[in-house]
Every structure is written in C-alpha cells, then in structure tokens.
C-alpha cells in the first residue's frame, strides 16, 4: 500500500488518474490477496482502471522481474493495450477491478503503476506516464 501511495504522492498523481496497474501477482493466495486488498483500498474511488499480472505470461524472473514488468508497463502505455492475466479462468467474483483475464484489452492508458515486491519487505511501485 505505502509503496503505491508514495509513488502517487511523489508524482503528484491521484489514485483516480491511474489507468493500469501491472500487479506483482505471483499467483500465491497470500501475496496476491495482500496486493489486491491494498489496491482495492487505495483505488477505492477509481472505477475505471485495469490490473493484470504479466508474470502469468513470462513466469517469475526473480531479480529481473521488476525490470521486465516495467518494460511491459511502458509498452502497455505506448501501445494503449492492457496485457492479459493468462490462465485467469475463475476470477474472484466480488472483485470489481478489471483483471484483464485471458486476452489483452485495448484501452486508454495515460498513467500506469508497476509493482515489485520482494522477500523481507523490499517493495517498489513505479509510476509511468504517457508523453
């Protein structure tokens, strides 16, 4: 939560301005649940953003994961396409976030966040803007 909140604050961007989030999304029940809860809390007033996990397409690249996901996020902004969460056949029903299941989605993306969380509380959230 704080990493995303600080990224927004540093960039002087509101949660309502975010169009896309590249979640850390390792497909673990605890980790994904914590991230989802943080996103739902911080972005409670934003009803129009998409969130996906590109790890579903490439696997977990460990130390390189954050860099590769930042590239995915930059390409999402450039191409105006939210990448899919591959194999998300049964999303949680009460989640109101567009999780971009199974296939990419064309959408306007001006501001995007990419999250990278590590063992021991090493957390980063990078905010990117279309120019």
Per-region residue spans from a language model:
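Conserved "HGTGT" condensation-loop signature of ketosynthase/thiolase-family condensing enzymes
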Residues: 1-131
């Amino acid at each position: 939560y704080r990493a995303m909140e600080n990224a927004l604050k540093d960039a002087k961007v509101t949660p309502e301005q975010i169009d896309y989030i590249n979640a850390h999304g390792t497909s673990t029940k605890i980790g994904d649940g914590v991230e989802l809860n943080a996103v739902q809390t911080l972005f409670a007033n934003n009803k129009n953003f998409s969130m996906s996990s590109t790890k579903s397409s490439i696997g977990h690249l460990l130390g390189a994961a954050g860099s590769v996901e930042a590239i995915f996020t930059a390409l999402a902004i450039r191409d105006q396409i939210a990448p899919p969460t591959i194999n998300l056949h049964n999303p949680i029903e009460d989640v109101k976030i567009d999780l971009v299941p199974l296939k990419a989605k064309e959408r306007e993306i001006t501001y995007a966040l990419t999250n990278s969380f590590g063992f021991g509380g090493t957390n980063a959230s990078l905010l990117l803007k279309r120019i």
